[in-house]
């Protein structure tokens, strides 16, 4: 049974803010991200053993990601989006090329392979007013590793 539900104005507004944030990431516009991301945000990211606490720590993490994948790009409009209240989920693809060193937590460095990736990417977010306060970002890490020539 297929059901449809009208997008609420709150959900539509949050999807617009999320798009603005992903567009800012794509343009490497940290000032806009700082407006959208709450100072006390928490990020749960695939592959990280611990959550990332705070806007500044999240920005540092994203800068490390971009140093590995300088052309990383979150595609909009989203393939799927839905939400309720202060929560939304968006699903899209993220693409990029592994051209920068990958620094592992144990200090090892993985040299770039020059290989491209294209993986489905989901983000579930909670908003406090017009600021993102919590995010869980998901992708298939095994598929990403295979595409990068690491598995």
Place the predicted regions along the sequence by residue.
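C-terminal and inter-domain tail/linker signature
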Residues: 2-151
